[in-house]
């Protein structure tokens, strides 16, 4: 049986909030069977839990925020991507502020931290959401589409007319597994244009942004001295974001995802469109690991 998984032990770390620029504590806590992914604001008294649910997402500036009432947890997509990449079903993510720390702008540090906690199988079948027919979300020329597929394939295309974005590196395809995610996707960093930074900081946004946690792009190219980690790092990061956004459906998805210039808002709309019609999907489990179309890292 393909089983649900959580962590073996608590892991604690800290980092800088992208928008606040302040230190944020983050703790990963093992959770119970069918508990799902839950974000917990421990800076509040009493602490407030917000489940990682697509219907609780509100888009802020270039990130996904979970919101309940007037309480939010922002910039969740990179840690959600790491959680999905390792196939973790049940986890409590404690944060000491209204946003998850940005770390280095990728999912890599979260992969490292979660692996420090160790993966533990739980005595319950892992649930998957199998897409049964095409579902799409469209905004202007942007699109996000699910199609039936025996696995989880992500195809993404960005479209930037800019010297830093070589045309041959604006599309990428990933057949999702823990191995491909960790080695081909998780280290891809977020990116932004230097010309936007002064405006953002003047409006109390991106106060924690730096070349230590993002790829900076000016009028001619990449500003970071070390350059890119991959020739197609920009589009790989969009795939990273999509993996995190799509995991808000509650379970690993079995489908093909095609994104063209898609972002957090459109990815979320796609999930809402899936949920709007129960005939779009079914919940499946696998009694034999050989039948599972998505390979995960083994739990030892």
UniProtKB/Swiss-Prot annotation:
Catalysed reactions, semicolon-separated = a UDP-3-O-[(3R)-3-hydroxyacyl]-N-acetyl-alpha-D-glucosamine + H2O = a UDP-3-O-[(3R)-3-hydroxyacyl]-alpha-D-glucosamine + acetate
Q: What is this protein called?
A: UDP-3-O-acyl-N-acetylglucosamine deacetylase
Cofactor(s) required, per the database record = Zn(2+)
Sorted alphabetically, the keyword list is: Hydrolase, Lipid A biosynthesis, Lipid biosynthesis, Lipid metabolism, Metal-binding, Zinc
- Reported function: Catalyzes the hydrolysis of UDP-3-O-myristoyl-N-acetylglucosamine to form UDP-3-O-myristoylglucosamine and acetate, the committed step in lipid A biosynthesis.
- Family per record: Belongs to the LpxC family.
* EC number in record: 3.5.1.108
State where Zn(2+) binds: 78, 237, 241
What gene is it encoded by? lpxC
Species per Swiss-Prot/TrEMBL record: Acinetobacter baumannii (strain AYE)
